[in-house]
Amino acid sequence: DDCIVVEYYIVTDSRFTQRFDSDQAVTDYVTVMFTGVQNLIETLNLDIKVRLLGVTPYHKESEPSFIDDSLLPGHETYVDARKIVRNMKFYFCNHNTGLAKSADIIILLITRKMGVLDPGDTDISEIAGASSISSVCQRCNNVGACVDNSDHNERADTVAHESVHLLGSPHDGEGPNGLGLPNSPGAANCPDSDGYIMGTRNEQNGKKFSECTKQCVKYLLSLPRASCVYENCSK
């Protein structure tokens, strides 16, 4: 019998790493965070397990240039959400070895703010995460970035949120357009105001996923392109 196991490789930018006394402390923190991610993913009721393959904390001297290359010009306290995903794809496509090669999803944790600045706009739209939609298992595309600038594990919800984008779900209230999955049910029938993780996250529903999200993830997992998350249960 097959089990669904989504395997993650986590990298942390040097500013994130600096918050900790050692690389082991970074790994310990992320390990606890992933207990939270597992608890949230379980609300999909799809028997999905998350597995942390490993953590690489970048330091100033070892940090790949794609992070600094992704800052918003003129607003260097912000990472450009679109650019960081694009640059991550390029970097890990060219460094597709070790844990990066083994992982179903690669996530970068950063402490800088992340935002989107559209042409002609002066106000930055601040966001907590960005990822490549429906791209689990797709080498060179299976990436996301999440902001974690607190000492608490509340960012498990951001990692879970971006994971579910990578697993084929839009935000609640959005149709399937843009998912790259022609027959996906989308999530237009679940208003974002219901307050689930892919919506406005209210007190009542903010720690679980909507039925629409569940159906979207279930659909992607039924396709051959998601085969990397299936493994023999005895492993």
Swiss-Prot record:
SUPFAM superfamilies: Metalloproteases ('zincins'), catalytic domain (SSF55486). GO terms for biological process: membrane protein ectodomain proteolysis. Its main location: secreted. Its EC number is 3.4.24.-. Residues 4-232 form the Peptidase M12B domain. Disulfide bonds join 137-228. It comes from the Eukaryota. Inhibited by EDTA. Gene3D superfamilies: Collagenase (Catalytic Domain). Its cofactor is Zn(2+). Keywords: Calcium, Disulfide bond, Glycoprotein, Hydrolase, Metal-binding, Metalloprotease, Protease, Secreted, Toxin, Zinc. It is found in: Secreted. Binds 1 zinc ion per subunit. Coiled coil: none annotated. GO terms for cellular component: extracellular region. Expressed by the venom gland. GO terms for molecular function: metal ion binding; metalloendopeptidase activity; toxin activity. Acts as a metalloprotease. Penetrates intact tissue and specifically cleaves the vesicle-associated membrane protein 2 (VAMP2) (part of the SNARE complex) involved in pancreatic secretion, thus disrupting the normal vesicular traffic. Belongs to the venom metalloproteinase (M12B) family. This is Venom metalloproteinase antarease-like TpachMP_B.
